[in-house]
């Protein structure tokens, strides 16, 4: 299966997408396009099969964010000015259940890293944050994300990945 990852387009078929998590399904179906085109508060990228170029297999959404410097472990902010850190928020990431276990999650997060590097080079940002569901913390950790202190005890875990780690992993200067 040849997969292409690109920005969400209005004619993309999102109604049948089902990752097993209704808030993630609803976001893609009801909000992703408007947030991208009308509100400019996030951009959604979709994985599609080249043979079925409108069927969404998975997606991620990126937005800008800033977080107070004191939310980070000292090793990540040593030597930085006392400002909030500019970041990219990995706001959503989901794979349709029909395509789970085929490496799409890896492909999606890898593309998110590539987009983040381009943004960092163009406007500057320190890293990526994600609010990982409790059952997905280990998955994000495998990519180098670390938990930030002060997260909600019952909600998602706020996690951080330094842009330098992404550069090293992708072997970019």
Please give the residue ranges for each predicted region.
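Short amphipathic alpha-helix that is part of the acyltransferase structural core
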Residues: 1-38
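Conserved beta-hairpin
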Residues: 40-64, 71
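Conserved acetyl-CoA-binding loop-helix of GNAT-fold acetyltransferases
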Residues: 101-115
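Short coil/loop residues immediately preceding or within conserved phosphate-binding loops
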Residues: 42, 85, 125-127
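C-terminal "cap" of GNAT-fold acetyltransferases
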Residues: 124-135, 149-173
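Conserved acyl-donor/pantetheine-binding loop and adjacent beta-alpha core of acyl/acetyltransferases
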Residues: 59-92, 100
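Conserved active-site tyrosine of GNAT-family acetyltransferases
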Residues: 130, 140-141, 145
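Alpha-helix termini
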Residues: 35-38, 117-123
